[in-house]
Amino acid sequence: MATPAVKVYGWAISPFVSRALLALEEAGVDYELVPMSRQDGDHRRPEHLARNPFGKVPVLEDGDLTLFESRAIARHVLRKHKPELLGGGRLEQTAMVDVWLEVEAHQLSPPAIAIVVECVFAPFLGRERNQAVVDENVEKLKKVLEVYEARLATCTYLAGDFLSLADLSPFTIMHCLMATEYAALVHALPHVSAWWQGLAARPAANKVAQFMPVGAGAPKEQE
């Protein structure tokens, strides 16, 4: 079997690496996940710094092209292989995808990441949860999710009545959030909850979720 032309470097438990993998899975692209160890400092080795001078993951190699930053990777993959997930070249739809991608990057993800770091990843980092940080960011996330609820009351997906990267991009960090007791923030909002359940049921999302065994840091809400 030929080696896939596309390689992704990183550890799949990372929601950033998994964001890139989700785009590849949705686009049906054959790829190789090149495993790395954060604990062993693989991301600080010269060969990886040559791929990404910031020493972060993921990194994607697509033939002679090397990319870093998970959202840039996802855009490249979909632009090349499944442009309908970016709005399909239609000006207004593409603009709405861009708007809600910016909302995810600057409004949703920062508080969600802060909660997930404390509730899920702090034990792996050898420290206790900082509940003050959690509480502060829960309030921020509530307000963002209320905006999502209002938007999703008017259309099936964030950019309109079509699935796009604007919906897929938050999946991996929300997957981590849903492994904590703060999944209740999503369940409390019917349109957000239905949107989330639809995303989580997608085959590509299911596959990527298997790479992300989260939930060690906090009890999962009982259903």
Swiss-Prot record:
Q: Which residues of this UniProt protein bind glutathione?
A: 14, 43-44, 56-57, 69-70
Could you say which protein family the record assigns here? Belongs to the GST superfamily. Phi family.
Keyword check for Zinc-finger: no
What Pfam families does UniProt report for this protein, alphabetically? GST_C (PF00043), GST_N (PF02798)
Give a brief account of the tissues where this protein occurs: Seedling roots.
What are the record keywords, sorted? Transferase
Give the multimer and partner information: Homodimer or heterodimer of GST-I and GST-IV (=GST-II).
**What's the name of the protein?**
Glutathione S-transferase 4
Reactions catalysed, semicolon-separated, are:
RX + glutathione = an S-substituted glutathione + a halide anion + H(+)
Task: Describe the location of the GST N-terminal domain by residue ranges.
Answer: 4-85
**Biological function:** Conjugation of reduced glutathione to a wide number of exogenous and endogenous hydrophobic electrophiles. Involved in the detoxification of certain herbicides. Most active with substrates possessing a chloroacetamide structure. Trans-cinnamic acid and 1-chloro-2,4-dinitrobenzene are not effective substrates. May play an important role in the benoxacor-mediated protection of maize from metolachlor injury.
EC number(s) in its UniProt entry? 2.5.1.18
Q: Name one GO biological process term.
A: glutathione metabolic process
Which organism was this protein described from? Zea mays (Maize)
What top-level branch of life does the organism fall under?
Eukaryota
Cellular component per GO? cytoplasm; protein-containing complex
Q: How does activity depend on pH?
A: Optimum pH is 7.5-8. Active from pH 6 to 9.
InterPro entries recorded = Glutathione-S-Trfase_C-like, Glutathione-S-Trfase_C_sf, Glutathione_S-Trfase, Glutathione_S-Trfase_N, GST_C, GST_Phi_C, Thioredoxin-like_sf
Tell me where in this chain the PTM Blocked amino end (Ala) is found.
Answer: 2
Question: Induction: what does the entry report?
Answer: By herbicides.
Q: Which GO terms describe its molecular function?
A: glutathione binding; glutathione transferase activity; protein homodimerization activity
